[in-house]
Amino acid sequence: MTLRLTIRPGEPIFDQLIFAAQKAFISGEYQVGEAFPSVRALAADLNIHPSTTHKAIQHLIREGWLENHPGKGTVVARPPQGRPSERRHLLQHEVEQLAVEAKRLGLSMTDVVDALAVQWSKLDKTKGAAGE
């Protein structure tokens, strides 16, 4: 399976790659234990520099999203749970970015909540289809 990445100007590719991978893991596009593409393969597929890809994969390993098995490659790990305070902190950062972008676009809080509900439902359906 190939990771999907839509390059957004103004945001570091490293951050976009991390987000795309985490989204793929959470949505069930990649299953626990499934092989993850090598640095070279992923860099070639996404047309990004291998050093950026290497740093992103190493970050995902350190954060517990991936596991490296010498001789076998890198596989998807169980998503890290972290402490509730850590999870809230990570979410807060994303919410701040979402709020700024929504305001910039002139959207109301209702628009944002509705869009979030739709996306949440899509993730639930994708996970269900993936056999979770």
Could you tell me what each predicted segment is?
Residues 14, 38, 72-89:
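Short, cationic-aromatic polyanion-contact patches
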